[in-house]
A protein has these predicted regions:
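Intrinsically disordered, low-complexity terminal regions enriched in charged/polar residues
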Residues: 1-282, 286-289, 294-298
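Contiguous, well-ordered alpha-helical segments that form the cores/surfaces of helical PPI scaffolds
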Residues: 37-42, 312, 329-332
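AlphaC helix (C-helix) of the protein kinase catalytic domain N-lobe
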Residues: 216, 220-223, 314-317, 331
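Activation segment of protein kinase catalytic domains, centered on the conserved DFG
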Residues: 293-309
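Residue(s) on the long, well-ordered alpha-helices that form the structural core
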Residues: 307-310, 314, 327
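Catalytic-loop of the protein kinase fold
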Residues: 317-348
């Protein structure tokens, strides 16, 4: 949780009058909103979170914020300086009693053990070798130095969601980060399967929560083996349950939805605005080919080939053209919320 302090009673960037727009559009108040949005973006980028809290102190009033990938819920102004008002102190007291999951930490991500981190770094060094493949070396260097970027263990449920089918992956720094606190917030990681010790590509994102819209795994299965489509392993919505390694009890999420999903959209209809806010569900996929940012192409010919492959791959995913699929090619690429290009690294499955 972060706290932003602003002096002056006019620094509150929101109106509290139903007859006026909610957001104040003065230059200073727009700058204040931009500042707290930036803080929220950084917080949700560098930590594995499902949501986050923050506090804004604007002169003699305070506001509470709850951020997720759909937007932010903003409280009414709290006159914390007024004698007898304990709302802000009560929030801080309750926040102190919360556990990590209640504060918004992702319950499926853990600090890697020393042995897991060492195995991950050793596998990276073995694949890079002497660094003759410059593109591959840049990709694997993206995991960052172990002293500055702690290794994490990410646990992903297989489609059936059974405890014994949870797969663990070790990751470092992400290849690219989201620049907004809302939306898909796609992040890609070079990851090591803890079970096999092989390197894979793990994509973490938030897919739109729209009835009837299927996750990427559904469509990848339909075009499996097609040219210009990545070699897919598995993918699923991220569940709210924590799988205890001791085999003991699990911690359930909200009873109405077993998956990590946004809440801001559920309350957006109660306030001004004619557009319905779209919610998001946390989603992860794993491919057995590596991917690097689109701007790491080698030359103009490589870039043109990449764009051609993107068009072909997206047409297959969009229309699920199953007959007469071409055999896999060394380079494959796809785009869903972020562009990437396949490397010539060895297949890992």
């Amino acid at each position: 949780m972060f706290v932003e302090f602003k002096r002056g009673n006019t620094s509150d960037p929101f109106y509290n009058d139903d007859q006026l727009p909610f957001e104040k559009l003065f230059e200073t108040t727009c700058a204040t909103r931009g500042q707290i949005v930036l803080y929220s973006t950084r917080l949700q980028t560098y930590q594995f979170r499902t949501w986050a809290f923050s506090v804004g102190i604007f002169g003699n009033v305070a506001r509470l914020f709850r951020w997720d990938r759909a937007g932010a819920i903003v409280s009414e102004p709290i006159p914390y300086c007024k004698r007898g008002n304990h709302d802000l102190a009560e929030f801080l007291r309750r926040f102190d009693l919360m556990d990590r999951v209640q504060r918004g930490w992702d319950p499926t991500v853990f600090d890697a053990t020393r042995e897991e981190a060492a195995a991950f770094d050793g596998t990276i060094e073995a694949v890079v070798g002497e660094g003759r493949n410059v593109l591959l070396k840049k990709l694997l260097d993206s995991v960052g130095d172990k002293d500055n970027y702690p290794r994490r263990r990410v646990e992903i449920s297989t489609p059936d969601g059974e405890d014994e089918r949870v797969v663990s992956y070790i990751v470092g720094r992400s290849i690219a980060n989201a620049r907004s606190p809302t939306g898909r917030a796609t992040r890609g990681f070079v990851a090591m399967s803890k079970g096999t010790g092989k390197l894979v590509f793990l994509k973490d994102s938030w897919r739109p929560d729209i009835p009837g819209m299927m996750g990427e795994a559904h469509w990848f299965e339909k075009v499996k083996g097609a040219r210009s489509v990545s070699a897919f392993l598995h993918g699923s919505d991220v569940r709210c349950v924590v799988v205890r390694r001791s085999g003991a009890a699990r911690t359930p999420g909200p009873p109405t939805n077993p998956f990590q999903h946004t809440l801001t959209n559920l309350y957006s209809g109660d306030f001004c605005g004619v557009r319905k806010m779209v919610g998001y569900i946390h989603y992860r996929t794993v491919q057995c080919e590596f991917y690097v940012p689109l701007d790491m192409f080698k030359d103009s010919k490589h870039l043109i080939q990449i764009m051609y492959d993107i068009i072909v791959g997206m047409s297959l995913l969009s229309f699920a053209q199953l007959p007469s699929l071409n055999p896999p090619q060394p380079y494959r690429t796809y785009t869903t919320g972020g562009s990437s290009i396949g490397t010539s690294a060895p297949r890992t499955s």
